[in-house]
Structure formats: structure tokens, C-alpha cells
Amino acid sequence: EGEECESGPCCRNCKFLKEGTICKRARGDDMDDYCNGKTCDCPRNPHKGPAT
């Protein structure tokens, strides 16, 4: 009861991590990716350039 997710970079103890939690650290000129509090996936930072 009350489970929001099973697993993923933005899921801990069956709950979504709060919005703004870093789920992927930046590399080089890249930018950090943050959880949005609504999904267990790590959404791509909208301010990044195209994926390479």
C-alpha cells in the first residue's frame, strides 16, 4: 500500500525521490540530471544539448 515505484534511479524504499534530487552527475561540459518527483526514471536535463 502506498508504493509509488519498484526500482530506478529516482526510486528509494518504493517512493519517488523528491524533486531536485540529483540522479546523474555531470561529466565534462554536461549538466546534472535531477529527479522530478513524479517518475522513477532519471529525466534528461532540459537545458542540455542533444544526446551524444
Curated annotation (Swiss-Prot):
Span(s) of short sequence motif Cell attachment site: 27-29
Gene3D superfamilies attached to this UniProt entry: Disintegrin domain
Keyword Ribosomal protein: no
Principal location class: secreted
Compartments, record wording: Secreted
Taxonomic superkingdom: Eukaryota
Domain Disintegrin span(s) in chain numbering: 1-50
Molecular-function annotations in GO: toxin activity
Tissue: Expressed by the venom gland.
Keyword tags: Cell adhesion impairing toxin, Disulfide bond, Hemostasis impairing toxin, Platelet aggregation inhibiting toxin, Secreted, Toxin
Cysteine disulfide partners in this protein: C5-C14, C10-C35, C11-C40, C23-C42
PROSITE patterns assigned: DISINTEGRIN_1, DISINTEGRIN_2
Any one GO cellular component localisation term in the record: extracellular region
UniProt function note: Inhibits ADP-induced human, canine and rabbit platelet aggregation by binding with high affinity to alpha-IIb/beta-3 (ITGA2B/ITGB3).
Family membership noted in the UniProt record: Belongs to the venom metalloproteinase (M12B) family. P-II subfamily. P-IIa sub-subfamily.
Quaternary structure (record): Monomer.
Additional free-text comment from the UniProt record: The disintegrin belongs to the short disintegrin subfamily.
Protein name as catalogued: Disintegrin multisquamatin
Taxonomic classification: Eukaryota, Metazoa, Chordata, Craniata, Vertebrata
